[in-house]
Design a protein with these regions (language model features):
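Bacterial N-terminal signal peptides that target proteins for export
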Residues: 2-10
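Bacterial N-terminal signal peptides
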Residues: 10-19
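Sec/Tat signal peptide C-region and signal peptidase I cleavage site
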Residues: 21-25
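Kelch-like beta-propeller repeat domains
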Residues: 26-410, 414-757
Length: 757
């Protein structure tokens, strides 16, 4: 058995073996109970809500798989190291997956996949070992029904990994066996294994119009340079780890729980953002091809930065197409993107960066919020994130595109733009600044200025889209809270400690014009890094999980935040609610469930101080991933609720449709008469705090009679892009609080557009 730091005292192995036996019995029954503690004080539950007890997939026993097998199908063997993992006779651990990424399927089940699978087998230093220790991530489908949870493993369990083999772009090239026997050393380990070159970790998830899900990108792990040999019969495999982005796209079919490969992107992408367009196609932006050493000998001009080329996926034929030079943009990893009501894609000045060290030489451009037009395939700069600076109104909407060094058309245009602006400013500086700053006093707001600019490791939540008096949707608002603020230096995109500052950005659409604005809101109770936001049917935003500081800079040294918070959209303030049971810092996740509750999971930290997985006394738990889930029941679940009886299974833009109400008793009848709004909520597809599909759309109630209501669908397809949604109705209780019903599943259809025939 190989030697490695022991994280669990040997005396616990007997009790863990017994626990594993009973867990196996539960697994064979297919059920694990979801236990909700009793509400001791009803008023407290109505004010703060309640978390269920944690629940998780049981351990399984069996034969440990071949390490070179591409599709590792089960967590196996019966030598438990702790309650999360099982160990074989060689000391290799196989652990239950944590929900680093998850998606709500149309039937209410949860698809999720692991993050950083295999880091538990690092012996000394993650930076030197993960290129060989990490393996492709497992996936699971979780079913929650009648108070029980059960799991199945999709096929293939690792989504098919990288069926075409890795496509690594190494600096060293193929230098193998240069010392000859008996020490056969390979300085490039990018092609020595097939069970770690297609990990789902750091892919993005997006929903397709037909109810399937697509994972875009992922990770190929290797060492560059690295040593892969045997010495005295013992394997030696270490080096400087590299994480390379994949070109792969993989589709999950919920009907048979299977994964299949679809078209490859033109660029490998690690941490990309994917978003559904109005016509059902998918836009992908950013990502990096090589995280640690972003140097590309075949394309030197693209070195030292993230991928600037955007691509569009045609759902009709499964192919990716590059969008052209003017569609390029320098963006952070996992840029916060949203589909606007006019079909443009809004970048909200947020993303991931490896703070405080940065990610690209041009990252100062990440401070500029912008919108991408899929029709013209161009970007328009709208403003400076968090400040009332209207770049689009001052004639500089294409400044960022012109500053892109790979834009061959930029030189003359940039000279002309700068020359014109200089002449105008010299002639009349006040007139030149007027279109940019509509209210100079806003720049004196200290909170706005401190919270302005690029925000790292934060959520960006599109607030409910609401129609105007004519039924048109012309304004979108976005809540940003927590994360880390922009650093002072241009090469430092973020600070170390989490912030509590929050703001709402807005985009108002007036014909072809888009006006950006921003305002500060009440802040979080404390600074929160990596908090996940969930939009509730009531328009409130739940914030869960995270830590007080950046757990990527120095993993394992943060303090987890257990107390959840609720944002009230009417007062624009946060308040504390119930405490979750388990600390969940890095790679946590959450999703709104069909009954209005919220599933919370994840926690897959990097090895402590980039060494091995161990919890430092008093700090965040870092002894491996947490495979458990818990469910938060918001305050509105502890009282009377309206109830939907029937509804359309599918609707088209512009249609009216009826919803039957369930007047099962006097309480339901009373609440049904008080219904004042109905909302369509897109099903969650979340990873690393982002969900490009996230949206809630308020539908006009055109008729409300006893036992039924009639709703009007938007006429704008970009407001409700085709795909799977949940329909909720909201009513006021006796205290005047908005209370949602349980939802009905509904599919929005639309005219799909093909790029390739």
């Amino acid at each position: 058995m190989k030697t490695r730091p022991s994280l669990v005292p040997a005396l616990t192995l007997i009790s863990l073996s017994i626990a594993s036996h009973y867990a196996l019995a539960a697994r064979n029954k297919g059920n694990v109970p979801i236990v909700s503690p009793e509400c001791v004080n009803e008023q407290v539950c109505k004010d703060k809500g309640l978390f269920t007890n944690p629940f998780e997939e049981p351990l399984v026993t069996g034969e440990f798989p071949d390490q070179d097998n591409t599709n590792i199908t089960n967590p196996l063997n019966n030598y438990p190291d702790n309650g999360k993992c099982e160990e074989n006779e060689d000391g290799v651990l196989k652990c239950k997956p944590a929900a680093g990424s998850l998606a709500l399927l149309n039937d209410g089940r949860i698809l999720y996949f692991n993050a950083l699978e295999g880091t538990e087998n690092v012996e000394y230093n993650a930076l030197l070992e993960i290129g060989s220790a990490i393996v492709n991530d497992q996936t699971r489908v979780l079913t929650m029904k009648n108070g029980n949870a059960s799991w199945i493993a999709p096929s293939p369990v690792d989504a098919g990994a990288n069926p075409d083999g890795n496509d690594s772009e190494t600096l060293i090239g193929d230098i193998s066996g240069f010392l000859g026997d008996p020490i056969d050393i390979d300085l490039g380990t990018d092609d020595d294994r097939t069970n770690n070159d297609g990990a789902l970790f750091c892919a993005d998830l997006v929903g397709l119009p037909n109810g399937e899900l697509m994972a875009v990108g992922g990770t190929d792990y290797y060492h560059e340079p690295g040593v892969n040999t045997e010495l005295l019969g013992q394997p030696i495999n270490f080096g400087l780890s590299e994480l390379e982005g994949l070109k792969n796209s993989r589709i999950f079919n919920p009907d048979d729980n299977s994964w299949r490969k679809t078209g490859d992107m033109n660029f490998g992408r690690w941490y990309p953002s994917a978003i559904s367009l109005a016509n059902g196609n998918v836009l992908v932006a950013s990502g990096v091809t090589k995280l640690v050493k972003p140097v590309y000998l075949t394309r030197p001009e693209t070195s030292g930065r993230n991928v600037t080329v955007t691509e569009t996926y045609d759902t009709s034929c499964g192919e990716w197409t590059e969008n052209g030079a003017l569609a390029e943009r320098s963006l952070p990893l996992y840029p916060r993107l949203h589909l606007l009501p006019n079909g443009h894609v809004f970048y909200n000045g947020g993303g991931q960066a490896f703070n405080p060290f940065g990610q690209g030489y041009d990252q100062a451009l990440w401070n500029i919020v912008a919108a991408y037009d899929p029709r013209s395939q161009t970007w328009a700069d709208l403003g400076f994130a968090g400040l009332p600076l209207h770049l689009s109104e001052a004639g500089v909407s294409d400044l960022t595109s012109l500053l892109n060094i790979t834009n061959s058309e930029a030189d003359e245009s940039l000279k002309g733009l700068l020359s014109g602006l200089t002449e105008e400013f010299i002639a009349n500086p006040f007139d030149a600044l007027a279109p940019i700053i509509d209210d100079p006093y806003k720049l004196a707001d200290v909170q706005s200025v401190l919270g302005a600019g690029f925000r790292g490791s934060t959520f960006s939540m599109m607030m409910p889209l609401k129609p105007d008096e004519n039924g048109n949707y012309n304004k979108a608002e976005f809540l940003t809270a927590g994360g880390v603020l922009t650093g002072v230096a241009a090469t430092s995109p973020g600070l170390y400690l989490g912030t509590n500052l929050a703001r709402i950005d807005s985009v108002t659409i007036e014909g072809e014009r888009m006006l950006y604005d921003s305002r500060s809101t009440g802040g979080l109770a404390q600074g929160r890094w990596y908090g996940t936001g969930v939009l509730l049917p009531t328009g409130e935003v739940l914030v869960v999980s995270g830590a007080d500081r950046d757990e990527v800079v120095l993993p394992g040294t943060g303090f987890p935040i257990l107390e959840a918070e609720l944002f009230d959209p009417e007062t624009e303030t946060f308040r504390k609610v119930a405490k979750q049971n388990r600390p969940r810092t890095y790679h946590n996740s959450a999703a709104l469930l069909p009954d209005g509750s919220v599933l919370i999971g994840g926690h897959a930290p990097i090895n402590t101080a980039y060494a091995y997985s161990v919890t430092l006394p008093g700090f965040s738990p870092n002894d491996g991933r947490d495979p458990s889930f818990e469910i938060y029941k918001p305050p509105y679940m502890f009282g009377e609720r309206p109830s939907i009886r029937t509804g359309a299974k599918s609707v088209h833009v512009g249609e009216r449709f009826r919803v039957g109400l369930k007047n099962s008793d006097a309480s339901a009848t009373k609440m049904n008469t008080r219904i004042e709004s109905a909302v369509l909520v897109r099903r969650t597809n979340i990873t690393h705090l982002i969900d490009g599909d996230q949206r809630s759309v308020e539908l006009p109630i055109v008729r409300h009679r006893s036992g039924r209501i009639v709703l009007q669908m938007p006429t704008q397809q970009a407001v409700v892009p085709p795909g799977d949604y949940m329909l909720f109705v909201n009513a006021r209780d006796d205290e005047g609080n908005l209370v949602p019903s349980e939802s009905k599943a509904i599919t929005v259809t639309g005219a799909l557009s093909a790029l390739c025939q």
